[in-house]
Amino acid sequence: MKIMILGSGAREYSIALALRRVDKNLEFYFAPGNGATESLGTNLNLKDPVVLATYAKEKGFDLCIVGSESFLAEGVVDIFKQQGLAIFGPSKAAAMLETSKSFMKSFLKKYRIKTAKFLNTNDIEKAKNFIYSLTPPIVVKADGLCAGKGVIIAKTHEEAIEETAKMLSGESFGDAGKLVVIEEFLDGYELSIFAVCDGNDFVLLPAAQDHKKLLDNDQGPNTGGMGAYAPSSLANESLLRKVQKDIILPTLAGMKKEGAEFCGVLFIGAMIVGNKPYVLEFNVRFGDPECEVLMPLIEDPLELILAATQRRLRHSKIKIKKEFAVGVVCASENYPYKSSPKSEITVNNIPENSHISYAGVSLEDGKLMADGGRVLVCVGTGKSIEEAQKNAYKLCDNVNFKGKQYRKDIAHQVLK
């Protein structure tokens, strides 16, 4: 079976690793991939969705899995389907749940799904009036995709107005910020909840928790994510039932009414306030680093993806292992401020019940080099969260490159 995976991070690497676990004969092609994905398959220097679809058809690919949201925003799923190709991910219209925050918020309001009080606007005067109606802190979001960096939490009314003006002028995020979403701040705890959907039905995956801040104890600047763990004991059965009834089902029904059936991964960034789930954001693909801790917990991820793509989730028996996973991101020394010089990665040995998912790496003269940002993720699994964490950090100690930085407290929320 020939499978194309679109993206270049640890998320895409972890998907291939998980699929290889259930079928050693799979052939992988990554577009564009990274220096480590070459050890799992073939990297393709292709990015244009039309070119990718043509190539996939010519080479007789059986399945394409979209890892990165940028491909979804370009309508890669629609293009592949027009060619009669099997692809896992939502259409361009359905992907607007992530690619346009204003669309997402209006959708939530229309279908009465709990979310923070908000205003979508491109008018600074309307923005000011709404900002002064809120009690700080105040959340200001750029409408479009900003590589996970388009959200500001302002401590004062004045800061919120200043950040809104910078977005609307194009100074902060270019065209992505020329429409903004201003929100009340919700005070609770965040969970990442994933549902794999086929338009009508869904399979709920274990709830994960991401760690956005660079430093221990949730200090320092925001990042793309410094680690994750799953399942989270903070997501009790009662809460997950509410998420299914009050968020996932009305979202699938609503998207169908909008003429954009949702097939793929619905990633709910949820804020839990008094055991009630509110939608902070939707993403329409696996999170990174959450994907790296979810993949080891799915008994047969290939069957899950195929069942969703073929719209037969209702009849598919997807099993989740009774295990835990912890993923610790090792980042380059200057992350997230600026790029760092390349340096060779050495791995002394990989202990049992652990593995590495590679992201910001390149291959030079047969050597794997740390090449920017989040370099790799050390993943540990175990029968308890304590065991999984121990295995992840044992692996971390065996991985070295110049300036390696990582958090020492991943999963602290449930290990206090």
UniProtKB/Swiss-Prot annotation:
Residues 105-310 form the ATP-grasp domain. It catalyses: 5-phospho-beta-D-ribosylamine + glycine + ATP = N(1)-(5-phospho-beta-D-ribosyl)glycinamide + ADP + phosphate + H(+). Its EC number is 6.3.4.13. GO terms for molecular function: ATP binding; metal ion binding; phosphoribosylamine-glycine ligase activity. Binds 1 Mg(2+) or Mn(2+) ion per subunit. ATP binds at residues 131-192. It is an enzyme of class 6 (ligase). Keywords: ATP-binding, Ligase, Magnesium, Manganese, Metal-binding, Nucleotide-binding, Purine biosynthesis. Its cofactor is Mg(2+); Mn(2+). Pathway: Purine metabolism; IMP biosynthesis via de novo pathway; N(1)-(5-phospho-D-ribosyl)glycinamide from 5-phospho-alpha-D-ribose 1-diphosphate: step 2/2. GO terms for biological process: 'de novo' IMP biosynthetic process; purine nucleobase biosynthetic process. Mg(2+) binds at residues 281, 283. NCBIfam families: purD (TIGR00877). Belongs to the GARS family. This is Phosphoribosylamine--glycine ligase. It comes from Campylobacter jejuni subsp. jejuni serotype O:2 (strain ATCC 700819 / NCTC 11168).
